[in-house]
Amino acid sequence: MSKFDDFMKLMNQYMSYHGFSFEICSDMRLTSYSGESKVSLVDSDVRVMDMDVFAKKAYRKIILPDSLSEADSINTADAFLINKCDEWYFVEFKDAKMSNAKTGVLKKAYSNVYAVMDVLYAMKEKNIEYPPFDYGNPIQFFRTHVIYILVFRGALNPHHAMQLKNHRLKHEHYLPEFMKRLE
């Protein structure tokens, strides 16, 4: 079983313990689909956790049992996955101009960390742990193992698309200025 499968098992146990059973596993193609433009920003069948489904259908109701509106949900990235080297990826898909998304992207980054830590520690209290996670130093674990990826539509963000292209030519990663606060 992969590390991602182990993590998904823990997430499903968490939901089950609270009386929820939703399919939170998806793929990049479905998770990156924009209903507005009717396209997927990523054409891949890589398995991911659909963070929006988890946040809106289960986590919101667990932490806010009286909530009747999905608007009460925490803001999360769209997708989450773990590779074989135990690097965690939160992926945000933006089919909009980035100037409209800067604050939301940063809030989502912190909300993701909070929600995942909340689940990990809640399950630890039930003697169910995700062994690769460092429960003794979670902040260091997140700094070392978590990567936040922002996928955007180049046509709507020509400046960022050009910067990305220039950085690729130099074999460098492109990090928009507003995301440097996440380093």
Tell me what each language-model feature is:
Residues A79-L81, E87-D95, N112:
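Conserved catalytic cores of phosphodiester-cleaving nucleases, focusing on short active-site segments
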Residues E70-D72, F80-K84, N137-F141:
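Short, charge-rich binding segments
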Residues N75:
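Beta-rich catalytic cores
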Residues A161-E183:
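Polybasic (Lys/Arg-rich)
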Residues A96-P158:
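Catalytic cores of nucleic-acid endonucleases
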Residues D6-Q13, A122-E125, M162, K180:
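Polar/charged alpha-helical tracts
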Residues M1-E70:
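Acidic-basic catalytic patches of nuclease active cores, encompassing PD-(D/E)XK
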